[in-house]
């Protein structure tokens, strides 16, 4: 039987990159430097469907394609884009110095970038003021990615914090470099000798992990973390906001967070903001802990003596677990993608992109600048299928599937989010609209800024 006219298959579905949030340096890749409060689609800078990794730093962004190409944009005053110059770049641009070198992962720090190739080599570019490039006698900055020669073993994971970086090798060893944690360590541990890895400007082995095998490393503004092949999480550094789930103010050496904190389940993945962490167990449960005053944890928290009071959303009922105690967030169970910015988060749940946390520059994408206290769908993306998400310090990026181009006589189609997720998205949107109307008539007090400074949409902890 011959096919009916116009019954040919639809053109394969396409994907597009969306960006929103702080944009003072063009880090959204939209060609301008105005903050964006709602998700905006980027013009094609590569085949969007082949993007495999999205991330950002203090004021720059990086995208890695399936073919291993690296595209960058945004702030570049220290050469953190690796383009051979220090001019700002308003559109995603290929890093030509790495052409022919397949990239596996990129980690963006405040003003530097760490790059991992598919063969396990690590390169760095940008500011080296705190030894964060891993080249102890190198220049103050580097505008072209250079290999970190002291990392001779194959590396499988990298991370970049505010002023320090980490790498995990194929054998499970963790290295750290950059002096970003040293100041807090000296202040909070007077009279104690800091381990070399907290003060080194070249890769130094993190002691205390000899009996474990790391598969992933993470970095916050003033802390570090490592996930092992046994599903255990080790943390060290500053515990100012309870992000280490410890009673200590500062951990000089790695300490394992007890399994009971995660309902005795093994951890499959971990993400870190500057002062909070998010972990997902092997069964898909998601736990959050750490700083909570901008809604970073997606839940209410109790405060305790020794930690400064955390602002809470008065519209959310009751008080929840302490912020330094990992607590399960049921609405995130089964999330397929999660990313942490400095103090906001993105997640893909049931195919729908969600956001929550700090929103001063619109990085939650809800069209406002009011902090978001619980995960909710990003309005402009709620009917697209979320594929990948990535955060910078104060901006957001998401790769979403677009509707398929229909054959003649057919209606557009797209692989839709699950029905339950779509229903939840609409319900949450309606509740949020009602809540926003109430908030417009409510008086709000200014947020405390005593230990923070803000610059063009960027946020940094003041390191004393």
UniProtKB/Swiss-Prot annotation:
GO terms for molecular function: guanyl-nucleotide exchange factor activity. It is found in: Cytoplasm; Nucleus. Residues 301-313, 421-443 have a biased composition (Basic and acidic residues). One of its GO terms (biological process) is negative regulation of protein secretion. RCC1 repeats lie at residues 14-66, 68-118, 119-170, 172-229, 230-282, 283-349, 350-401. The keyword Ribosomal protein does not apply. The keyword Repeat applies. It comes from the Eukaryota. Its main location: cytoplasm. One of its GO terms (cellular component) is cytoplasm. Residues 301-323, 411-464 are annotated as: Disordered. Keywords: Cytoplasm, Guanine-nucleotide releasing factor, Nucleus, Phosphoprotein, Repeat. The modification Phosphoserine is found at residue 427. Probable guanine nucleotide exchange factor (GEF), which may be involved in the secretion process. PANTHER family: ANKYRIN REPEAT-CONTAINING PROTEIN, REGULATOR OF CHROMOSOME CONDENSATION. Interacts with SEC5. The interaction occurs only in the presence of magnesium or manganese and is stimulated by dCTP or GTP. This is Secretion-regulating guanine nucleotide exchange factor. It comes from Bos taurus (Bovine). The gene is SERGEF.
């Amino acid at each position: 039987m011959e096919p009916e006219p116009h019954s040919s298959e639809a053109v394969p579905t396409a994907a597009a990159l969306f960006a929103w949030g702080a944009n003072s340096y063009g880090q959204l890749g939209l060609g301008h430097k105005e903050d964006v409060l709602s998700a905006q689609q980027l013009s094609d800078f590569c085949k969007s469907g082949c993007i495999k990794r999205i991330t950002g730093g203090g004021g720059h962004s990086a995208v890695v394609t399936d073919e291993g190409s690296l595209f960058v944009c945004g702030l570049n005053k220290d050469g953190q884009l690796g383009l051979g110059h220090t001019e700002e770049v308003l559109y995603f641009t290929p890093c030509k110095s790495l052409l022919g070198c397949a990239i596996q992962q990129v980690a963006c720090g405040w003003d530097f970038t760490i790059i991992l190739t598919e063969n396990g080599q690590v390169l760095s570019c940008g500011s080296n003021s705190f030894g964060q490039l891993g080249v102890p006698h190198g220049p103050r900055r580097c505008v072209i990615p250079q290999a970190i020669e002291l990392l001779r073993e194959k590396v499988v994971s990298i991370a970049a914090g505010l002023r320090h970086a980490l790498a995990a090798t194929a054998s499970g060893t963790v290295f750290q470099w950059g002096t970003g944690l040293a100041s807090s360590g000296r202040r909070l541990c007077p009279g104690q000798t800091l381990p070399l890895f907290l003060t080194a400007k070249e890769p130094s082995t993190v002691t205390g992990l000899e009996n474990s095998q790391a598969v992933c490393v993470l970095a916050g503004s003033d802390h570090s973390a490592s996930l092992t092949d046994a599903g255990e999480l080790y943390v060290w550094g500053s515990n100012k906001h309870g992000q280490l789930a410890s009673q200590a103010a500062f951990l000089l050496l790695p300490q394992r967070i007890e399994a009971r904190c995660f309902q005795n389940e093994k951890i499959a993945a971990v993400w870190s903001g500057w002062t909070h962490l998010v972990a997902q167990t092997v069964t898909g449960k998601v736990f959050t802990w750490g700083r909570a005053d901008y809604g970073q944890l997606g839940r209410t928290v109790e405060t305790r003596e020794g930690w400064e009071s955390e602002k809470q959303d008065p519209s959310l009922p009751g008080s929840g677990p302490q912020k330094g105690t990992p607590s399960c967030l049921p609405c995130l169970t089964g999330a397929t993608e999660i990313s942490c910015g400095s103090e906001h988060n993105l997640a893909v749940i049931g195919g729908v992109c969600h956001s929550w946390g700090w929103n001063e520059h619109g990085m939650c994408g809800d069209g406002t600048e009011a902090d978001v206290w619980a995960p909710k769908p990003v309005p402009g993306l709620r009917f697209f299928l979320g594929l990948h998400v990535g955060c910078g310090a104060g901006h957001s990026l998401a790769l979403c599937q677009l509707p398929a181009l229909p054959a003649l006589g057919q209606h557009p189609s797209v692989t839709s989010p699950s029905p339950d997720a779509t229903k939840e998205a609409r319900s949450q949107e309606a509740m949020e609209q009602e809540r926003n109307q109430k908030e417009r008539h409510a008086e709000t007090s200014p947020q405390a800024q005593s230990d923070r400074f803000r610059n063009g949409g960027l946020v940094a902890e003041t390191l004393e």
